[in-house]
Structure formats: C-alpha cells, structure tokens
Amino acid sequence: MFAITGGGTGGHLAIAKALAQEAQKNNQQSIYIGSQIGQDKTWFEGSSLFTHCYFLDSTGVVNKKGLGKIKAIFKQLKAAWEARNILKKHKIEYVISVGGFSAGGASIGAILSNTPLFIHEQNAIKGKLNEILTPFAKAIFGSFEGKSKNFIHTSYPVRDEFFTHSRVREKLHHLLFLGGSQGAKGINDFALQIVPELLKRGITIAHQCGERDFERIKKAYEHIGILDKVDVFAFDKEIVLRLQKADLCIARSGASSLWEMSANGLIGIFVPYPYAAKDHQYYNALHFTKQGLGLLLRESQLDMLRVFTFIESLQKQEDSLSEKSHLLMSKIQPNGAKEILEHITSLMSH
C-alpha cells in the first residue's frame, strides 16, 4: 500500500487522481493525505479511489509573513507528526507527493518515518516545497526539463480523451478563448477587443469566460451586436470537445492546460497568469514557444497587431499549422501515470 499526498488546486489534484486511477486498475491500494483547506475535500472526500482519506489541519507557508508564517510552519510540523503516525498505521511502503502546500505534512512525515518519498513536479519551475524536499526524495518526476540528479523525465498524466480526440490542424477556421473556470479578466477583455475583427476575417469564435465574468462578457457582446455570432459560455465539463473543434487557442499556461493542448495537437497563444508563484506559468509556456510551438505574450503585451501577425504567419506558411500540430502531439505520450508508477515499482525493487 502507498500514499498520495498534495493538492490544494485542480492541477495538482488532477495528477493525484490520475495516479490513483492507474493504481486501482492494477489492484494497488492507496490512501490519500491532503488538507482541510483548498479543493482536496471537494475532490476526494468519500472517494472510492482510496481505502482511506485524511485531511489534515495545514496551510501554505510561502505567502505568509511574520506571525502568520510562524503559525503556518507550526501547523505543517503538527501535520507532519500526524502524517507520520498515519503512514505507520497503514504500513505505507512509499509516498507520492504531487505538490502544493497540502503535500507538506505527509512529505515531511515520510522523511521522519524513513518512508521512501517520490515527487511529481508539474511545472517548469519547481515549487518552494518541492525545492526543499528534492534532496530527500528517491526520485522526482516531471515533463519539463529537470536539473536534479534524481530527476526522471516522464509524460505528463493527461486523460485519455485528449489523445483520442486529437487531430492535426490544417487550416485556421475556429479560435477558442479559454478564460478558465474562474475567469481570466485580461483574456476576457482582450477577446472583446479582437473578436469583431476575427469574425470579419471569417474565423469563428468560442469563448469560455468563467462563472464570475459570464454576465459581463455576455452583455458586452450583446452591446457590440455580435452575441449571436459568438459561442460564449461560462464553463464546460466537456472541454476536450471544445479543444478538438478549435484550430488555435488563447489561454493561460498552467501545466495541465498546456499538456492537454499538446496531446490534442492544438497550438496556443499563451498569456501566463501574472501572479503565479515564481512566474511558473511563463516558464511553462516558454518550454513550448522556444520550439516555435505557440506564441507567448505577457498580459501587458496583449494587442491585436501581435496576435494577427502570428495568425497570419500560420495562415500564409503552407503546412506551418499541420507541422506544429504534429510536433505538439509528438511531445507527449499517453499513460503518463502508468509510466510514473512503473518507474516507482522498479526503483522500489532495487
């Protein structure tokens, strides 16, 4: 039996879920150790993927100052002691951390109990916790470049449907704006500027603007007089079908989104979230754009001229779109979670 820990936000939790599902397929039992704060409970409370789920009283340390930081460190140490006892109780063979602040307790607990620790780093720049824990880990897995001696490159765990619904793009007919489930105001506002011109050029538009911004964006399109020409929606659980239909996507550059688009063969214009820790979204996107697989623009650089120059370069150069689409699909293989678990099995047997 092994333990999965970490989460807080959807990107980390999606990795945890992929690993748990793969383990369950192989009749491997696992427990989950997360936090009472963040999305951990929403995702896994009562989940049949795990034999037991524990949500410890822990919080993030990095963004705290003064007394708040001291309290957060104390909570993490208390959670680490609790996790140590949980690991012993279930005779856990190893711990897999998927990152995020809620991984702190069980990861430190693993070190305290001498339980092998494996880490998955989802971003191009290591999170603070993963940076601290790397020397103590048996291996660290990632899909971007890694510099540590114990780094093992694997495909990013992406759901099968992003591969099965993939296609090589030949022509640029349909553009998808992904403002995210929360709504990225910078992307949403830029869409309002550029969409009328895109429509004039014969490009059809779908726009996910997030629950919070849906009414404002809908009214704005109505005011411009193009609401009937734009497929505007707040959120769609079947986002894979939206990606499949698109020939180009303007989106943030969280790791999951990037690799899902890569698996799907969809080229992106990436607008990193400006307040992401260590600016990791910028470096995530840079991994792709330095290979010519997309365009990277800071929110402050978003303007129609830059975007249309990029669109025109894709339209004018014969085979440019299909070549990039092919290259994106070749960067990632299915079964990323299986690959990680196989590496762990091999390392544990030595």
UniProtKB/Swiss-Prot annotation:
Q: Does the keyword field hold Plastid?
A: no
Example of a GO MF term: undecaprenyldiphospho-muramoylpentapeptide beta-N-acetylglucosaminyltransferase activity
Q: What is its main location?
A: membrane
- Positions binding UDP-N-acetyl-alpha-D-glucosamine in this chain are 9-11, 123, 159, 181, 281
Q: Which GO terms describe its cellular component?
A: plasma membrane
Q: List the disulfide bonds.
A: none
Please give the catalytic activity noted in the UniProt record: di-trans,octa-cis-undecaprenyl diphospho-N-acetyl-alpha-D-muramoyl-L-alanyl-D-glutamyl-meso-2,6-diaminopimeloyl-D-alanyl-D-alanine + UDP-N-acetyl-alpha-D-glucosamine = di-trans,octa-cis-undecaprenyl diphospho-[N-acetyl-alpha-D-glucosaminyl-(1->4)]-N-acetyl-alpha-D-muramoyl-L-alanyl-D-glutamyl-meso-2,6-diaminopimeloyl-D-alanyl-D-alanine + UDP + H(+)
EC number(s) per entry: 2.4.1.227
Q: Quote the pathway field.
A: Cell wall biogenesis; peptidoglycan biosynthesis
Q: Where in the cell is it found?
A: Cell inner membrane
Annotated GO biological process: carbohydrate metabolic process; cell division; cell wall organization; lipid glycosylation; peptidoglycan biosynthetic process; regulation of cell shape
Q: Which UniProt keywords apply?
A: Cell cycle, Cell division, Cell inner membrane, Cell membrane, Cell shape, Cell wall biogenesis/degradation, Glycosyltransferase, Membrane, Peptidoglycan synthesis, Transferase
Looking up InterPro entries in the UniProt record yields: GlcNAc_MurG, Glyco_trans_28_C, GlycoTrans_28_N
Q: In what way does this protein cross or attach to the membrane? A: Peripheral membrane protein
Q: Does the keyword Cell division apply?
A: yes
> What does the UniProt function comment say about this protein?
Cell wall formation. Catalyzes the transfer of a GlcNAc subunit on undecaprenyl-pyrophosphoryl-MurNAc-pentapeptide (lipid intermediate I) to form undecaprenyl-pyrophosphoryl-MurNAc-(pentapeptide)GlcNAc (lipid intermediate II).
UniProt similarity note: Belongs to the glycosyltransferase 28 family. MurG subfamily.
Kindly give the HAMAP family that the UniProt entry links to this protein.
Answer: MurG (MF_00033)
Give the protein name, as stated in the record.
Answer: UDP-N-acetylglucosamine--N-acetylmuramyl-(pentapeptide) pyrophosphoryl-undecaprenol N-acetylglucosamine transferase
